[in-house]
Every structure is written in C-alpha cells, then in structure tokens.
C-alpha cells in the first residue's frame, strides 16, 4: 500500500466502534497512540500498512501494572507465549510484505512457589526492565531454572510463518544489580529480528560500524594472517584484500572501505527516565532498529507503547508512528514525552 494513501481514516468511526463492529480500517491514522487492548486494536488496523514494528512486550511475571487484560501475568509461560503469538500474528498481517519486527525480550527464573526476593530493594520493580525472580512454581522447571522465555517465543513465532533472521544481544554496562552468588550476573537482553517475507527492507549501510585501525592497515598491505606480502606467492593461498594490490603489495587509502557490517552484539547502556514507567528501553536502541528497518517517512508500529520511546525516536528521525497502550496513564505520559514535555 503506497504511503500517500495512509494519511487518515476513510470513515468517521471511533476505534471503539470499529472494534465492536468487527470492522477494519482501509487506511491508517499516523502519529497516534490508541488506548486499549493491543490485540483488539491490531485487528482493526489495515493489512500491509506499516513498514516495521519495534517493541518490547511486558516480560513474564515480573510486575503487575494493575490493568485488566494485561500481558505478563499469565499463570504459565505457555499461556504467556500463546497470547504474544496471537498479538504478533496480527502484527505480521499489518506489516508490509517487506516489513520487519524488532522484538526486545528477556528471560525469567523459576521461583520456589513462595515469596521471592527482589534483586534490588531500592528498585523493587527494576530500573530498566531486567528480569527478577518469580514467586510461583513453573511447570516443567525446577526452582532456580532459567525458563527460556525468549527462545520459546522466537520458535513459536517462527512456527507461525515469521522468518527468524537475527538474535541480537543488547549488552549493558549498567545493568540492574543482582545479589546472586551461584551464577554470573546478567548484563544483556535479546532483540530478535523477524521478517515477514524472504526479501525485506534492511538498510545495512545505515548502521555500518567503523573498522579497527589495525584491520585497515592489514587490508592496505593486502595481508591475511601470516602472509607477508599482498602479491601472490607460488604455492601459497591467495592473500585476502578488499582490492587488487599494487605491484608491491599496497593499495590506495581511497580503496579502503572504513566501515563493516554491524555485529550482532550491541553495547547500549540504559538511560535514566524520570517518568513513571519502569521499563523504558534507551532511545539509541530504537534508533538503531529504525535506521536499518524503517525508511525515511515510513511508519513504525509499537503495540506495547509504554512510555513512548518508539514514537519519540520515530518523530525525531522523520518517521511516523502508530502506538497502542493498555494503560491510559502511560498513553498520556507517552504523548508528553513525544511532545518534549518530559
């Protein structure tokens, strides 16, 4: 669907009425946050209408947002995965054929079935969404087992037709402290990259990284490992270089590409947020996803809008956003943040 068609609603019908009548919009309203159940609202959005989705659903059994129909407080991990699979099946329908999903998710440990301990007493809900201990027993898991939520979800989505393209590690130098003494403290979360189709939009150049100076020098000499010269040596493998070496094994500086493809470990620290949302991911994380997955002027969807980070970054980068948030207080918070009020 051409982007110029996505400028507003074709009928003056509220989202609530649209859902009640089981009707679907033929166009999509931009730069808006719909308040309500994400699954029901997604069902009212048109097919093939957004370029990408960047989101972080509530993690399993970590906190209670005090809302009916909230995701994350299911009795079992299987129920949690089932509900998210329903949501992302609708996301896949709403995405354009060349669209991508960037899904941030973290794991949880099984508890003992009694009152558990929070990791940081000063921040009982977590500074940055890092997983804390469960209080309830988990079927199929022993107490203290890591449940494996991220991969349970990744495989479930793959089974519904998504292409699982990347497991990106979001590494943090300032993770939430953990007082455990029988395992390493965790400092990372997962970002799964899914695509709707085999071929999809991915601007690898927009997120390319500088190569190391030593790598550039090695390429200039046309050397690989222990090979001494850039020119071929009889009886030895052809040396690696990014261009044909000159006669004495040198190539021009101008022939050196100073960039390399971005690696799948992203070092991005969390940032303080003074709003009343406990699990806001950093703007830099969203920026990287949008650079690669959403063209300028494109539309990004976030069905778990929270504090509005996705919408804020999209607006700053010349993209449009469509958000969904269950809690009306967070919707108000997100609008203020996107407008620069926070």
Protein language model features and the residues they cover:
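Core catalytic lobe of class I
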Residues: 2-341
């Amino acid at each position: 669907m051409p982007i110029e068609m996505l400028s507003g609603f074709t009928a003056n019908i509220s989202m609530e009425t649209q859902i009640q009548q089981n009707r679907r919009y033929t166009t999509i309203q931009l730069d808006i946050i719909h308040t309500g159940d994400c699954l029901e609202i997604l069902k009212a959005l048109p097919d093939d209408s957004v370029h990408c989705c960047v989101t972080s659903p509530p993690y399993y059994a970590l906190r209670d947002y005090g809302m009916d129909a909230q995701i994350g407080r299911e009795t079992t991990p299987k129920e949690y995965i089932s509900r998210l699979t329903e949501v992302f099946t609708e996301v896949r329908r709403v995405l354009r054929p060349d669209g991508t999903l960037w899904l941030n998710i973290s794991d949880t440990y099984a508890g003992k079935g009694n009152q558990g301990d929070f990791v940081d007493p000063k921040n009982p809900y977590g500074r940055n969404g890092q997983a804390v201990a469960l209080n309830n027993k988990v079927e199929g898991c022993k107490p203290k087992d890591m449940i494996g939520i991220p991969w349970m979800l990744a495989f479930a989505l793959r089974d519904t037709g998504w292409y699982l393209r990347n497991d990106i590690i979001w590494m943090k130098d300032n993770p939430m402290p953990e007082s455990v003494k029988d395992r390493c403290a965790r400092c990372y979360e997962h970002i799964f990259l899914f695509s709707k189709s085999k071929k999809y939009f991915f601007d690898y150049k927009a997120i390319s990284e500088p190569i190391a100076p030593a790598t550039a020098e090695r390429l200039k000499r046309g050397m690989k490992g222990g090979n001494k010269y850039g020119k071929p040596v009889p009886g030895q493998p052809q040396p690696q270089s990014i261009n044909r070496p000159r006669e004495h094994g040198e190539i021009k500086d101008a022939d050196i590409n100073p960039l390399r493809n971005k690696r799948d470990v992203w070092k991005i620290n969390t940032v303080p947020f003074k709003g009343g949302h406990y699990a806001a991911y950093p703007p830099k994380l969203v920026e990287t996803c949008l650079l690669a997955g959403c063209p300028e002027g494109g539309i990004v969807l976030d069905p778990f809008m929270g504090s509005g980070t996705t919408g804020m970054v999209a607006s700053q980068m010349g993209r449009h956003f469509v958000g969904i948030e269950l809690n009306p207080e967070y919707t108000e918070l997100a609008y203020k943040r996107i407008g620069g009020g926070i």
